[in-house]
C-alpha cells in the first residue's frame, strides 16, 4: 500500500475501475425500492464552474448514500443544449452551433467525470440531438391536439438596424441592442403559446402536495400564479355602445371610482379618443410602445398617462368619469383596463394627485365621524362604506359580496377569479432551438407534421450574420414543403421553441433514454417517477419548475404518466461566493491575483479597496477554476470542502485555508487506516468488552446515528462531515488498536466516508483486504446497546461551587449518588467535620451539599 496519499493516482484508478465494473449503471428488474436523484442539467458552456460542482456533488452524495441504504438508484445527467450562446458563437467565431455545442459537451463531460460522480452515462441526453428533439416535437403535437398550443400576435424586441428579433438578454437596461447599439423597438409578431392558464388553479392548489419543497419556492410560485378573487365590472362609454370591462379585487370601492384607465394597446383606445386628443394620444402610444413591460411597470418609475377626451359612466351612481390611457396598464394583464379609486389605492392616489383627478372617499375607519376626510395618503384598510348609496354603513368586507350580487342582478358585473399567470409564449425567432413541427398551407391553414415525419431536423450549412430574419426564414429549400394534408405547396414554421420546453420533460426521458420508438414507456416512467430528490439553483424557482409541473399535469391528462407532480423533494443549493475587491471610487473590480489581501489597494491608483464576498463570476475577477483545485488537491478534497463549508441551502464562501484543512483531514484518515493492522476475531459482544472498547464502540455508533440523521431530510452534510472528523479523532486516540471494536471502527469510518470522498474510501477499503467495492456495502446500522453509557461524570458542589467530579454508575439512584459523593475523596475532604444542612441531587448531573458558613 502507498505510504503517501496520492489523490490524482487513486482517483484516476478507481474512476476507470468503476466504469469497467458498471458500478453506476441503473439496475433494472430489481425488487429493491427505487430512488431517483437528479441535478438540474447544465447548459454546455464549455467549462465547469464551482456552482456546477456544488450542485452535482450534493446530488452524488445522496445517490451514493441511497445505494448503500439498499435502494436501486437512477442518477442520470444530460445537457440543456439549445440556446442563444451557440448562435452568438456561430456569428462571432464562424462555427456551426452544433460543432460548438458538442465540443463543449465533450469538454464538460470530461470535467464532470473527474469529480467521481456516480452517474449512469448510458442515459445521457442532449436536447439538441434529433434523437431527443424528435420527442420534444411529438410532445408539442400532444399539446396541439389537446388544444393547448395556439397562435396569436405578441410583442417582440426589434432591432431596427439589424432588422432582427432580440431576446430579452440581448437588450441592455437602457433599452438598447447589445450588438448594434440601436434603440430597441417593440413589434407585433404572430407567435405560438401554450395554454398554461388552463392549469392555473391546479398548479396553485397542488403546491400543498409539495411538502418536500422549500416554503420560499412555493411562495414564489404562488405569487407568480397570482390568484385574485374579485369582480368583473363594466363601465359604459358615453355616447357609444361600447363598454369598458375591468377586474377589481375591491368592488366595495366602486362608488369611489373617479376615472378609468385603458392600456395604450387596448382596442377601445382609438374608439374613445376624441379628435382634439388624437394627436397627443397617438404620440403617447408611440412613445410607450417601444418600452418593455418591465420598464412600464417598474414601481420606482413615475406613472405616465394622458386623457383620451372620452368619458365613461359609473353604472352604480351614474357619475361621468374621464377615460385615460397610461403606461402602467398592460393589455395582456386582466382585461387591459383598470378603474381608478385614488382614495383607497396607493398607486391610484399618487397618479390622481399628479393628474389633478378627483379623490372620493367611500371607506372610512370604524367610529370615524368624518365621511369626507381630506386624505394625505390612500386609506387601504377595511372599514365602513360611506358615500355608497344603499350600501352606506355596511362593513367593507361584507360590501364586496353585496356589490357583486347587486351588479349581477343589474347586468353590469359578476364574481370572477383572475390569475396573474399568462399563457406561455414559446416562439423564438432563432435557429438553434427545436423546430416547431407545423406547416402553414394556404388552403388548409396550420397543419401538424405527421408523427411518421418527425423529427423535423434543423437544416445544416446555415449562414449566421446576426442581421435580418431568423436564419431558418432564409432557408428556402427547408421552408418550402408539400402540405401534409393536401399535398399543395406550403411553408414550414420558422420559429423554434423556447428552450424551457426542452427542460420541461427531460426527467421523463431519463427513465427510458435509449427508447427510439417512444418518448418513454409508460411503465418505466411510472416505475421511476416522481423524482425523489431534485437539486438546483433558486433562480429556477419559478419558470423551469412551474413549466415542468405544467408539463407533468398535461401528460398525466393525456395518459402518458400517472403522477401529478414531477419532483417530490427539492433542494435549492446556495451560491458559491469568493472574495472580491472593488474600487469604491471607480466602481471597478480588481483581479484577485493583483491585490495584496493584507493591504488591499488598487494597483493602478493606490486607492483602498472594498473587500467582500460575492458570487463567483468573470466580471468580478473572483472565480476559482475547479480544474486547478482538482489538480492540486484531488476531487475528494474538493467534495469534502463543498460539503463541509456550509449547509447546502446556504451560500458558501470559498476559503483556500478550509480547502487545505479538508486535504489534511483526508491525509489523517489515510495514515490512520494504513497504520492499522487488521485482526480477525469473534463477533463483538458488549459483555466481553473493556471500558475503553465500550467507549470507542459508543463513539462509533454515535457517529452512525448522528450522520444517518444528518443525511435524512434536510441533508446537513456539514455536520455529517464534523461527525466523521470526531470518529476519526476517536480512532486516532484509541489504544485498543488490536481489538475487533477498532476493526469495526475503521471499516465503519470508511463506509460513512464513502458517499463524501468515494475514491479514498475505496482505496483504503481495498488496502484492508476487501475484494469488492465499498460502494456495494450496506450502510451501517446503529446498535442501541452500544450507545448505553455505563458510567457518567457526576459534579460535586459545596454551596453551589464545584469542587470536582467523579465517575459513577449511570443507573445510580438519588440515594446512591449522595452516598458516592459523600464517600469520595472530594466529599470527605470538603465535608470533614461539617454539618450538612441539605443535599440537592440532580440525577445524572450533580450533587450539591449545603453546609453552614
Curated annotation (Swiss-Prot):
E.C. designation(s): 6.1.1.4
An example molecular function term from Gene Ontology annotations: aminoacyl-tRNA deacylase activity
Keywords: Aminoacyl-tRNA synthetase, ATP-binding, Cytoplasm, Ligase, Nucleotide-binding, Protein biosynthesis
Binding-site positions, ATP: 618
Domain of life, per lineage: Bacteria
Main location per the UniProt record: cytoplasm
PROSITE patterns: AA_TRNA_LIGASE_I
UniProt GO cellular component terms: cytosol
Catalytic reactions of this protein: tRNA(Leu) + L-leucine + ATP = L-leucyl-tRNA(Leu) + AMP + diphosphate
Location(s), subcellular: Cytoplasm
Intervals of motif 'HIGH' region: 42-52
Coiled coil: none
Xref: Pfam families: Anticodon_1, tRNA-synt_1, tRNA-synt_1_2, tRNA-synt_1g
InterPro entries, A to Z: aa-tRNA-synth_I_CS, aa-tRNA-synth_Ia, Leu-tRNA-ligase, Leu_tRNA-synth_edit, M/V/L/I-tRNA-synth_anticd-bd, Methionyl/Leucyl_tRNA_Synth, Rossmann-like_a/b/a_fold, tRNAsynth_Ia_anticodon-bd
HAMAP family per record: Leu_tRNA_synth_B
NCBIfam families: leuS_bact
Name of the molecule in the record: Leucine--tRNA ligase
Species this chain originates from: Crocosphaera subtropica (strain ATCC 51142 / BH68)
Gene transcribed to yield this protein: leuS
